[in-house]
Swiss-Prot record:
A lyase-type mechanism (elimination/hydration) is suggested for the cleavage of the lactyl ether bond of MurNAc 6-phosphate, with the formation of an alpha,beta-unsaturated aldehyde intermediate with (E)-stereochemistry, followed by the syn addition of water to give product. The active site is at 83 (proton donor), 114. GO terms for molecular function: carbohydrate derivative binding; carbon-oxygen lyase activity; ether hydrolase activity. Belongs to the GCKR-like family. MurNAc-6-P etherase subfamily. This is N-acetylmuramic acid 6-phosphate etherase. HAMAP family: MurQ. Pfam families: GKRP-like_C (PF20741), GKRP_SIS_N (PF22645). The keyword Lyase applies. Pathway: Amino-sugar metabolism; 1,6-anhydro-N-acetylmuramate degradation; Amino-sugar metabolism; N-acetylmuramate degradation; Cell wall biogenesis; peptidoglycan recycling. Induction: Induced by MurNAc 6-phosphate that releases the repressor MurR from the DNA. Repressed by MurR in the absence of MurNAc 6-phosphate. Its EC number is 4.2.1.126. PROSITE patterns: GCKR, SIS. GO terms for biological process: 1,6-anhydro-N-acetyl-beta-muramic acid catabolic process; amino sugar catabolic process; N-acetylmuramic acid catabolic process; peptidoglycan turnover.
Length: 297
């Protein structure tokens, strides 16, 4: 493939004079380019919605959501996956991020890893991939062999698949059920896809994981009601969430949380339904953890 022909690799005529600009002119130029990212995302929202539905269905069926990429793309997948347990209270391993070259590649590039299609497949084999898992490949260029190899293996197993690329009609788009291709144009710094392309991928991942978790009942209204109160900040957030959801005084929210082991959902249910902690837990179990359903019983 002629990489120079990729949109993400071409020169940006608006930034030719970067090295001659004042600092303010330079950062203003970056900012103008970044404005193109949400516009590109808007054009692919239907595809993102499809991917959210696939991810939610896979997770409901007991599968996993697996992100996979090289370099910046891989790091972004690992970042999004690592935020899911504390934010949504899901177990580690439910959302997984893989990067070409393994964990060490998060800090230091592993030469040649992204060019090895067999490595992508091997990394999924090591996870004991099954057809219930969803695999999402990330590659700004849309042609990374590591990602293509993984997606082909996932497709052979019958996994739901999606790909996130910033080039139109890319090779990985032809390997998946859902292709998400926000075309953000040439980078301000030629070929540096950690810039607009990376931002676009992060925005898509935000929507994908958050949207799936909303559909799994991890959100009530716009509150993260399955947050794990693992530090002082999150204990305070848990209390504020209960107050926001119920209108109760902080002291009442703290009392309810103490009885539920600082689990937010049953604490909210206790206050709004006027029941004790045990009944709140039982009612949530009856409704598969969906707080709104438990409240409207």
């Amino acid at each position: 493939m002629n990489l120079g022909a990729l949109v993400s690799e071409t020169r940006n005529p608006a930034t030719m004079g970067l090295d001659e600009m004042s600092t303010l002119e330079m950062v203003s130029c970056f900012n103008q380019e970044d404005r193109k990212v949400p516009e590109a995302i808007e054009k692919v929202l239907p595809a993102i919605a499809q991917a959210v539905d696939l991810a939610a269905a896979a997770l409901k069926a007991g599968g996993r959501l697996i992100y996979l990429g090289a370099g910046t793309s891989g790091r972004l997948g690992v970042l999004d996956a690592s935020e899911c347990p504390p934010t949504f209270g899901v177990p580690h391993g439910m959302v997984i991020g893989l990067i070409a070259g393994g964990p060490g590649a998060l800090l230091k590039a592993v030469e040649g890893a992204e060019d090895d299609a067999a490595l992508g497949e091997a990394d999924l084999v090591a996870l004991d991939l099954t057809a219930t898992d969803m695999v999402v490949g990330l590659a700004a260029s849309g042609r990374t062999p590591y990602v293509i190899g993984a997606l082909r293996y996932a497709r052979q197993l019958g996994c739901p698949t999606a790909a996130i690329s910033c080039n139109p009609d890319s090779p990985i788009a032809h390997e998946v059920q859902v292709a998400i291709s926000p075309v953000v144009g040439p980078e301000a710094l030629t070929g540096s896809t950690r810039l607009k392309s990376g931002t676009a991928q992060k925005l898509v991942l935000n929507m994908l994981s958050t949207g799936a978790m909303v559909k799994l009942g991890k959100v009530y209204e716009n509150l993260m009601v399955d947050v794990k109160a693992t530090n002082v900040k999150l204990v305070d957030r848990a209390c504020r969430i209960v107050v926001e959801a119920t209108g109760a005084e902080r002291s009442q929210a703290e009392a309810a949380l103490t009885q539920t082991g600082f689990e937010v959902k049953p604490a909210i249910l206790m206050i709004l339904a006027g029941i004790d902690a045990q009944e709140a837990q039982q009612r949530l179990q009856q409704h598969d953890g969906y707080l709104r359903a438990a409240l409207t019983r």
